[in-house]
Amino acid sequence: MAKVITMGEIMLRLSTPNNEKFIQADEFDVCYGGGEANVAVSLANYGHMSEFVTAVPDNEIGECAVAALRKYNVGTKHIARCGERLGIYFLESGSAMRPSKVVYDRAHSSISTATEADFDFTAIFEGAD
């Protein structure tokens, strides 16, 4: 099987439960993901070696995001711990004729403030297909 590297932003998704609107919700469901992270998880589920490269804050929320990847056997050894916050997006799931709504809060997230110096690209791509 292939060794595939993906790089992008992992985000914290806060979703309203039970198709509630934002204004109706008293709580949110939590999930971690993002386009490239989701690809890494899918590849791992198909038996490939996948490694996700990103930056997360060096705090408990950052570690929760990393743990969410690890539980699907996605490699996390090249995730930088830097910056101050994880990007967040809020999801109001649509219902019947009402469309879903998404609100992004990702300004100044860890990956957006990371620099090339935060990553060892030679090590990251070693053995990648």
Question: Predicted segment positions?
Answer:
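Short, basic and Ser/Thr-rich N-terminal targeting/leader segments
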Residues: 84-87, 98
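A short alpha-helix-loop-beta-strand transition element characteristic
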Residues: 76-85
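An anion/phosphate-binding loop that grips the pyrophosphate of nucleotide cofactors and donors
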Residues: 128
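Structural alpha-helical scaffold elements that stabilize or flank donor/cofactor-binding regions
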Residues: 123-124
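Short polar/acidic secondary-structure junctions
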Residues: 81, 93-95
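Short beta-strand scaffold segments in enzyme catalytic cores
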Residues: 88-92
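Glycine-rich phosphate/adenosyl-contacting loop at the front of the ribokinase-like
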Residues: 1-77, 97, 101, 109-119
